[in-house]
């Protein structure tokens, strides 16, 4: 009898362990955005950042375009950790990016065909995380990383009712974010990056300026395009935190971000 009880205990323990593993694997992607220090300096260094919570993009399953190009070198070709900070006026993005051919851009290349970071963000904490269509408070922001112009764009073509805020910067040759700042520092195999996006850039006449507060949770995702040679027709790898390019039209595929002190 005692042997049977011990056997059942082992079986139950294994079942519980497997159950916990399954839950962990199915858990949605989530990160924290920490309150920025009052004296933050945008210099490309990440020394002021809390890097305990990152959106990590570094595996083959996250390559959603031209995977053959990425497989040749793997994470050395492109991989990144993205961090987020905030205050009442700005959203801050920091990143450590490995890229063996960084800062590739050519005039006339759209952001999706150049080296560019992409932010997917909801500015409506009350939005249903399971929604499958963009609303006016859902944003796809492109930021070209070329070590010179740092052009930006906002894609709104997928929104049925955009509340008067149309797509801008789709050609990759404009700076559409008023007050935007960007700075990089080269490191072995890549670079570190700091960006500032004023909350006012993600608002309009019918879209109020977002007012973040500790404890709020919103939908978010991150992606990166990687051009290895600035020539028409060359493959441009795309990696996505979500592991799918359907994030372009379906925010239910995004992860989540909680604002913290």
Predicted regions and their residues:
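Bacterial N-terminal signal peptides
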Residues: 10-19
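Sec-dependent signal peptide cleavage junction
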Residues: 18-28
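Bacterial N-terminal signal peptides that target proteins for export
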Residues: 1-11
């Amino acid at each position: 009898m005692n042997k049977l009880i011990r056997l059942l205990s082992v079986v139950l323990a294994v079942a519980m362990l497997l159950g916990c593993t399954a839950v962990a694997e199915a858990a949605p992607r989530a990160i924290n955005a920490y309150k920025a220090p009052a004296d933050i300096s945008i210099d490309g260094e990440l020394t002021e950042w809390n890097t305990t919570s990152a959106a990590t993009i570094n595996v083959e399953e996250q390559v959603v375009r031209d995977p053959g190009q990425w497989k040749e070198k793997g994470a050395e070709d492109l991989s990144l950790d993205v961090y987020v900070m905030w205050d009442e006026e700005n959203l801050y993005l920091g990143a450590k990016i490995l890229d063996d051919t960084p800062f590739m851009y050519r005039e006339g290349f759209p952001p999706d065909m150049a080296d560019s970071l992409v932010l997917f963000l909801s500015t409506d904490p009350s939005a249903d995380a399971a929604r499958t269509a963009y609303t006016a408070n859902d944003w796809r922001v492109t930021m070209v990383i070329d070590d010179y112009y740092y052009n930006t764009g906002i894609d709104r073509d997928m929104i049925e009712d955009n509340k008067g805020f149309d797509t801008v910067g789709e050609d990759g040759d404009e700076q559409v974010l008023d007050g935007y700042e960007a700075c990089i520092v080269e490191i072995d195999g890549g670079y570190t990056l700091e960006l500032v996006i004023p909350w006012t850039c993600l608002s309009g006449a019918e879209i109020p300026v977002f007012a973040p507060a500790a404890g709020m949770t919103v939908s978010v995702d991150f992606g990166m395009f990687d051009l290895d040679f600035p020539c028409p027709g060359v493959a441009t790898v795309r990696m996505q935190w979500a592991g799918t390019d359907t994030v372009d039209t379906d925010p239910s595929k995004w992860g989540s971000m909680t604002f913290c002190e």
